[in-house]
UniProtKB/Swiss-Prot annotation:
<feature type="binding site">
    <location>
        <position position="8"/>
    </location>
    <ligand>
        <name>S-adenosyl-L-methionine</name>
    </ligand>
</feature>
<keyword id="KW-0808">Transferase</keyword>
<comment type="function">
    <text>Specifically dimethylates two adjacent adenosines in the loop of a conserved hairpin near the 3'-end of 16S rRNA in the 30S particle. May play a critical role in biogenesis of 30S subunits.</text>
</comment>
<protein>
    <recommendedName>
        <fullName>Probable ribosomal RNA small subunit methyltransferase A</fullName>
        <ecNumber>2.1.1.-</ecNumber>
    </recommendedName>
</protein>
<dbReference type="InterPro" id="IPR029063">
    <property type="entry name" value="SAM-dependent_MTases_sf"/>
</dbReference>
<dbReference type="GO" id="GO:0005737">
    <property type="term" value="C:cytoplasm"/>
</dbReference>
<dbReference type="InterPro" id="IPR020596">
    <property type="entry name" value="rRNA_Ade_Mease_Trfase_CS"/>
</dbReference>
<feature type="binding site">
    <location>
        <position position="10"/>
    </location>
    <ligand>
        <name>S-adenosyl-L-methionine</name>
    </ligand>
</feature>
<keyword id="KW-0963">Cytoplasm</keyword>
<dbReference type="GO" id="GO:0003723">
    <property type="term" value="F:RNA binding"/>
</dbReference>
<keyword id="KW-0489">Methyltransferase</keyword>
<dbReference type="Pfam" id="PF00398">
    <property type="entry name" value="RrnaAD"/>
</dbReference>
<dbReference type="InterPro" id="IPR001737">
    <property type="entry name" value="KsgA/Erm"/>
</dbReference>
<feature type="binding site">
    <location>
        <position position="83"/>
    </location>
    <ligand>
        <name>S-adenosyl-L-methionine</name>
    </ligand>
</feature>
<feature type="binding site">
    <location>
        <position position="55"/>
    </location>
    <ligand>
        <name>S-adenosyl-L-methionine</name>
    </ligand>
</feature>
<feature type="binding site">
    <location>
        <position position="98"/>
    </location>
    <ligand>
        <name>S-adenosyl-L-methionine</name>
    </ligand>
</feature>
<keyword id="KW-0694">RNA-binding</keyword>
Amino acid sequence: MRAYRDQHFLTDPRIVARIADILDISGRIVLEIGPGEGILTEALLERGARVISVELDRTLIERLSRRFASEIADGSLTLLQGDAVKVPLPPFEIVMANLPYSISSPITFRLLDIGFEAAILMYQKEFADRMMAHPGTRDCGRLSIMLQTYARANRCFDLPPGAFSPPPAVRSTVMWIEPREPLFPIHDRKIYEDLVRELFTRRRKTVQSTLKALAGMFGKEKIDSVVRDLNPEILSSRPEALYLEDFATISNQLSS
């Protein structure tokens, strides 16, 4: 397996230190995704973390194994070779990673499903902007709704292309994410996730149109009941115009 084509390695030690110092990680189990040459790995180990690093590239795994042989031997570092979106992960508490841009979305969804205490993750700035898009605005999408339903997200700082090798064509953003209970009760998480995905897959359609298309998933009788009971303003809206409470309302009616 080779490294992701869009993987850009951090090279600025001052920025690495700044990232590693955001949280107190001494004695904590930290998951690192895409360690590359190990510059962030080293900083995490120096701060007393027990690190689990997942790397796709077998050549990089071999280099990391040589560089951190003593840390692997004493159990402070575990290396896993594979795709972080798919590979089985041992228990961890905190996530710190310079994510390859191409897996930003699937790994974020996976981490939210698994659960963690806090995550410091680096994204393409445009992706981070979409994560932070407010419900009810045009830039809002599946990513922003799911993230803001199940987590708090804060922007730490932006990074210039020169902080990486090779330099990307865009700026990057470091985000601090902490899971939380939904602001509005959700009776069935899977139904909520399915609903949000289906609504934004058909984002140019109204809620009513999409619900009727989901009769095969939920049953015509259930869909007819939900359409009958929902606020007409919600039914006539497109998904980007909805708020978190609206998604919860629709989902809970589908699961009742």
